[in-house]
């Protein structure tokens, strides 16, 4: 339960496209993620997605931004904890053909039955049915629009 007595919403699992946009300085995406955090929306960032995003731009700024995301109140980092999780991740890679960072996103979303938050839903469509539970994908359709704002909505169906 959340502090206001309502049910805590299912976490969003952030994919590499969202993290990369943030590290590249996309203010709209960063503001969107900060808005989710301010509203108490839980967010999960798989550790290997952080690795994938940090490969895009190798810099101290990128590292600082990724460390900053970890400090947000509603963000939790999903580590690759042990051999069992590593073997499960390998199975996801084998079943989907995804690279390790996207496969970690898929594995976390699959295990927790949480939606993947992405900038590229098309990238995920072919993998929606590859896992034990169908992946649910939410595409950020208009990153400059505040969550719950007017118009078509900041989140679009994946």
Which ranges hold each PLM region?
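Acidic, PIN/NYN-like endoribonuclease modules and their adjacent C-terminal/linker elements
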Residues: 1-7, 110-158
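Metal-dependent nucleic-acid phosphoesterase active-site entry motif
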Residues: 1-27, 45, 50-51, 158
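Alpha-helix capping/helix-boundary segments
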Residues: 18-19, 49, 104-105, 122-124
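A short secondary-structure junction motif
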Residues: 19-28, 47-68, 90, 94-96
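Short beta-strand scaffold positions
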Residues: 45, 80, 100, 118-119
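Acidic catalytic patch
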Residues: 72-95
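Acidic, metal-associated active-site segment
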Residues: 99-115
């Amino acid at each position: 339960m959340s502090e206001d007595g309502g049910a805590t919403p299912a976490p969003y699992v952030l994919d590499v496209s969202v993290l990369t946009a943030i590290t590249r300085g996309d203010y709209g995406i960063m503001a969107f993620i900060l808005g989710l955090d301010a509203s108490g929306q839980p967010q999960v960032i798989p550790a290997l997605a952080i690795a994938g995003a940090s490969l895009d731009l190798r810099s101290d700024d990128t590292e600082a931004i990724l460390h900053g995301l970890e400090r947000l109140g509603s963000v939790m980092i999903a580590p690759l904890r042990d051999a069992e999780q590593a073997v499960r991740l390998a199975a996801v890679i084998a079943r989907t053909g995804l690279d390790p960072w996207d496969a970690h996103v898929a594995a976390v979303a699959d295990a927790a039955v949480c939606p993947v938050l992405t900038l590229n839903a098309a990238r995920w469509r072919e993998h929606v049915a590859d896992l034990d539970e169908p992946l649910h994908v939410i595409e950020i359709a208009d990153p400059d629009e505040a969550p719950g704002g007017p118009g078509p909505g900041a989140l679009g169906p994946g």
